[in-house]
Regions:
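Alpha-helical substrate-recognition element adjacent to the catalytic core
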Residues: 1-84
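Asp-based, Mg2+/Mn2+-dependent phosphohydrolase catalytic module
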Residues: 87-105, 110-145
Length: 145
C-alpha cells in the first residue's frame, strides 16, 4: 500500500511498515504529524493497486498508528484503492487535491510503477527494499522541508 502526503502543492508517497499485529509505525508518519503541529498544511492519501479493494479498506480500518488512530482516519477521502494502475491513482488524487504532478514525489518498490508514474512528471524514487528513512529525507530535501 502506498501512502501519499501533501504539503501545500507537494505530494509525497511512502510505504508504511507494520510492526506488530495491528500497529503501524513509520518515522515518516511521525514526521508528518510533527510538521502539521508546526502549522504546515499536510494531507495524507493512499493509493493501492489490488483486486481486493474491500479487503484493503478493511485492513486500513483496523490498522492502528502509534497515536491510536486508525490508518483510514489519517487519510480522509484521499484514498484510491482499485485494480487500476498507479497513473490512474495519481490522476484521481490530482483531481481531488489540485496538486500538479510536477510537485509530487512517489516511492515504490516496483520499476513498472516508477516508469509509468514518472511519465506524468512526478519525481519517483525507487525503493527496492521498501521505504527507508533516507528516501523520506531525500524527498523532504527535494522540496525544502
Amino acid at each position: 500500500m502506498d501512502v501519499f502526503l501533501t504539503h501545500g502543492c507537494i505530494l509525497f508517497a511512502l510505504r508504511c511498515c507494520i510492526l506488530s499485529s495491528n500497529l503501524v509505525s513509520s518515522y515518516a508518519l511521525a514526521d508528518i504529524n510533527r510538521l502539521k503541529s508546526e502549522g504546515l498544511d499536510i494531507r495524507a492519501a493512499v493509493a493501492s493497486r489490488t483486486d481486493e479493494p474491500h479487503w484493503a479498506r478493511f485492513c486500513m480500518d483496523h490498522l492502528v498508528v502509534e497515536d491510536g488512530s486508525t490508518l483510514s482516519s489519517c487519510f480522509g477521502n484521499l484514498v484510491e484503492i482499485s485494480y487500476n494502475d498507479k497513473t490512474h491513482h495519481f490522476r484521481q488524487l490530482h483531481k481531488k487535491t489540485g496538486i500538479p504532478f510536477e510537485h509530487m514525489v512517489f516511492f515504490d518498490n516496483e520499476h513498472w510503477n516508477i516508469k509509468q508514474v514518472s511519465k506524468l512528471g512526478v519525481k519517483c524514487i525507487y525503493t527496492p527494499d521498501g521505504m527507508m528513512k533516507k528516501h523520506w529525507e531525500e524527498a523532504k530535501t527535494e522540496f525544502g522541508l
